[in-house]
Design a protein with these regions (language model features):
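Intrinsic disorder/low-complexity segments
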Residues: 1-21
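Metabolite-binding pocket within alpha/beta catalytic cores that recognizes anionic/polar moieties
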Residues: 15-151, 305-307
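Non-catalytic positions within long, well-ordered alpha-helices that form the structural scaffold/packing
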Residues: 96-99, 196, 215
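Generic non-transmembrane alpha-helical segments
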Residues: 156, 160-171, 258-266
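Active-site/ligand-binding-proximal alpha/beta "capping" segment
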Residues: 167-201, 288
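Zn-dependent metallopeptidase/amidohydrolase metal-coordination segment
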Residues: 205-243
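His/Asp/Glu-rich mid-to-C-terminal helical/loop segments that flank catalytic regions of hydrolases
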Residues: 232-279
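A short, charged, Gly/Pro-tolerant segment at domain boundaries
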Residues: 272-307
Length: 307
């Protein structure tokens, strides 16, 4: 049996027999260019089984800047998954199973504002959901949960990322609203201009439902957005194409790596934000009416509140 498959079989067996998975504290979701950060040590790949299906890829775990980190390729290695096809529930649940407490999501975005220029970084403070075909909650099936989501990103993680950008001299916009579209087609001019009239600043296809699911899993979450284009509204710039996006992404990978390295090193412990207790007052279902099936399926997320 090839080494990769043998490692996967061993992990599945250890889970089935009550064994433990290797643990991490910081998760990174992004492209394959982030897998090989300079200085990462003791690298191993882990496939994680979840009640929500298979994650996009194996998690790549290692030690970096004295911290245990886990990387996941959102669209799978080789970019085989459309944004709609990404199993965000499995991806986030897998991070939770690995013990991750904070997630940095790295993604490409279009700019809806003149001041957000290609090659800039952005740390959106708000999301506007325009997706239509994605499962956006772990709950249901007899267990009703309503999380607070007025502040969808973790202020601590955003502050650390903003500080890293400042220290490195990388032009970064902290704040603003990211509208998440379904895709895979880019916007029409009508859509792009409507989003601008609504006060949106950035447009992308990936941060939702990730951010909602991370909050349900009580994992801190923030998006490090790489601006690659002006969508299609700007009269002095061509409409976005995949070649344009890839060109700017290639140029921005080095900046992203440097920001992540500095942010991972600076991330404070232990957590003091509200993300860690997001479900404390969010479970609505009468505890006596929650089925054993729901309890078992979701025990990783709600077990500490159900007793």
């Amino acid at each position: 049996m090839p080494p990769g498959r043998r490692r996967y079989a061993e992990i599945i067996n250890s889970e089935g027999e009550g064994g433990s998975l290797p643990q991490a504290e910081i998760g990174i979701i992004g492209g394959s260019g982030l897998y090989n950060l300079p200085g990462i040590e003791r690298v191993r790949e882990v496939r994680v089984a979840t009640p929500f299906g298979r994650p996009s890829d194996a998690y790549r775990l290692g030690n970096l800047e004295g911290r245990k980190v886990a990387f996941l390729s959102r669209h799978g290695r080789g970019h085989t998954l459309l944004p709609t096809e990404v199993n965000s529930r499995a991806n986030i649940y897998g991070f939770k199973k690995l013990g991750v407490e904070r997630i940095i999501s790295v993604s490409a975005v279009g700019s809806l504002r003149e001041e957000y220029r290609p090659m800039d970084m952005a740390l959106p403070a708000q999301f506007f959901d325009r997706t239509r075909q994605r499962a956006s909650t772990f709950f249901g099936g007899g267990l009703v949960v309503h999380i607070s989501f007025d502040t969808p990103v973790c202020p601590t993680v955003v502050e650390v990322l903003a500080g890293a950008c400042k220290d490195l001299g990388v032009r970064c916009h902290a704040g603003g609203t990211y509208v998440c579209m379904e895709g895979p087609a880019f916007s029409t001019k009508a859509e792009s201009n409507v989003y601008r009239s609504w006060g949106m600043d950035l447009i992308g296809m990936t941060s939702l439902p990730e951010a909602k699911l991370a909050r349900e899993a009580e994992i801190c979450y923030a998006t490090l957005a790489m601006v690659t284009d002006y969508d299609c509204w700007h009269p002095q710039h061509d409409a976005v194409t995949i070649n344009m996006v890839l060109e700017y992404l290639t140029h921005n990978v080095e900046n992203s790596q440097k920001i992540l390295l500095r942010a991972i090193r600076a991330m404070p412990q232990p957590r003091s934000c509200k993300c860690a207790s997001a479900l404390a007052h969010a479970i609505l279902t009468d505890r006596t009416r929650i089925s054993s099936t729901a309890r078992k399926k979701l025990s990783l997320l709600v077990g500490k509140y159900l007793g």
